[in-house]
Amino acid sequence: MINNSLTELFYAQMQLIRRTEQTFFALYGRGLMAGTVHTSIGQEACAVGVVNALDRTRDVIFSNHRAHGHFLAYCDDVEGLVAELLGRRSGVVGGIGGTQHLHKDNFYTNGVQGGIVPNAVGAALAEKHKQSGAIVVVFLGDGTMGQGVVYESMNVAALWSLPLLFVLEDNQYAQSTHRCDEHAGSLAQRAQPFGIESAETEADDVFTVYAAAQRAVAYVRRQNRPFFLVLHTYRLAPHSKGDDTRSAEELQRYWARDPLARLAAVLPDAQRAAIDAAIEQRIEKAVEKALTDEVEEIGDWRLEIGAHQSLHPPIPQSPNLLISNLQSPISYLESLRQSLHTILEEDSTALVLGEDILDPYGGAFKVTKGLSTRFPDRVRTTPICEATIVGMSVGMALRGLHPIAEIMFGDFVALAADQIVNHAAKYPAMYNGQVAVPLVIRTPMGGGRGYGPTHSQSLERLFLGIPHLKIVAASHLHDAGALLRQVVADREPVIFVEHKLLYPLALVRGEGRRARRETERLRDWRLGVEDWAPVRGDGVLQMAEGVDRFGYPVALARNYGDDETPDVTVIAYGGMSRLLAPLLIEMAAEEIRMLACLPTCISPLDAAPLVWAAAQSGRVLVAEESPAAFGWGAEVATQVHALAGDRLYAPVARLGAAPTVIPAAKPLEDMVLPSQAMLAAQVVKLLEM
């Protein structure tokens, strides 16, 4: 028997979705909207039927590019949605996200097909970890079922028994391509090999959808396991605004099955007219208000990472646990390992996940050894699924956890590029500062161990300059473990680069060395005599440490005294420190005074300490392990020339790997990668200019 109150409610919600989206088409026609719009006209029963089966006070939704219906059914914020698509400040995310990128409370969308699915898996893991009782729903379309990350996500959701409801809206088309030209077999059976229960139903009747959703939601909540619900529906409007290639006969056939018209037919005319009038008035007022609203300003925090207080951690009193305070020599590897233990001890929201990280193996490079024994519930080994490892971590971070994801080899970050670039780095600014993504991706980079072309690269270069993403690299002239603790405290996503050849090296120590606590700008960034300290056990090297304006340490090392100036400055980062430390000693023997500058936050880049270091000598070499062309060194050289060009005696020199694959054979690898001898030759060449 039909419930009259539900009939009225469902009709009002479906009509609100329909008329709002039709209004968007009208606004486009008037030239008041730009870009694109993806409507769900004809699919309203899916959104309304599923959302009304949820607990809006706690359940979480991840949706896709076609999310207006889900948003209105869940958030009931037509005013915020209209303003968003009109690009106004009062939009749900200030006009930044537009039609595809919406967020309010527990509702998230993104426009990349399939990308939201591992985010939803991570959110489900977070809710399970917090014991909130919430379930997570992820809406996806039939076209998205071609994405591999969807199946990675299903596997993990089933493996870890997560409270996640997959809702597949099968509208038969992926933009313009029909399902029969894209998928073999049954979509409804795709979840079964993972042991995920599934059901399917026609979605031309909202009560049928509602009943199916109620059963699915009850199962997920009761069993704490995923469920796969397939809703067979049809999109009656174009993919976007006017790109419909379907035949008139086909459209007419499905208009005759319109779920909204079917529901409207059972309501009394007067009741339906009253609902329609109220909806029209609400939409008209929303449009009128939005058109008089201002456009959001692009503030400094969106243009430059670290300038917005709510998205950046406070600079600690001692930004790096100073090496001079270490009680005994410690290796780069042990420093990282100890810090991971400390992080999990002190932060109950911190979780570590990655491939082969459990004891007794403890990870490919043994950084996680001992962690799973002490923290069995917060250290999770994963399948081989880099995109989902990072994607899950994004979802966990959005829901209040502090995930630390390990990618076994840095070369494999390419498999997670979409999650890093289009999800982790996008959400905070795309959602107008309403969320943070405190995610750390630890990964070993670099060559020198004979692992060959696909396990030896320095692919952090691929992510340099990505807005709202930090790349931090520790050398053995820094306390790597303390730096790891600092990036975990950061509220923005960080790729933490660990060089493989540094793991066994002892951290280089300076006696009495102290940190500078200011965040100084270009013309003020300098070090005084009192900041330098000799390296223990070495009569040549001295070290100092500064802090860039993002709060991250910058190590400096020199081979000359207080009353001298350097002949040359070498700027590098990360694993290059293993070459620079002995190079300083070699240059001292040749009576060449050298200053080495190694920042840790290599992107975004604070040029001030690098410019200061360059100006000390007027001759600068920038070195990196990846090929020099289009690399980090190019940006450093540009900044140095622009800001200190009048103090240079020669153009900035650059050194990087040869522009080819990194061979496995040791003699060939040595020919390709930068070496101490290559650095020395470049220094001598600079001094001859």
List the model feature ranges, each with a label.
Residues 1-46, 231-232, 236-322, 329-375, ...:
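Conserved acidic/glycine
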Residues 19-26, 30-160, 178-184, 188, ...:
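Cofactor-binding active-site loop characterized by glycine-rich and histidine/acidic residues
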Residues 27-33, 96-110, 133-138, 172, ...:
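Glycine/charged-rich beta-loop-alpha catalytic/anionic-binding loops adjacent to active sites
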Residues 39, 61-64, 94-95, 121, ...:
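General beta-strand structural signal in soluble alpha/beta enzymes
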Residues 104-285, 358-440, 448-450, ...:
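Thiamine diphosphate
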Residues 449-497, 506-522:
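Internal gly/pro-rich beta-alpha loop/helix module
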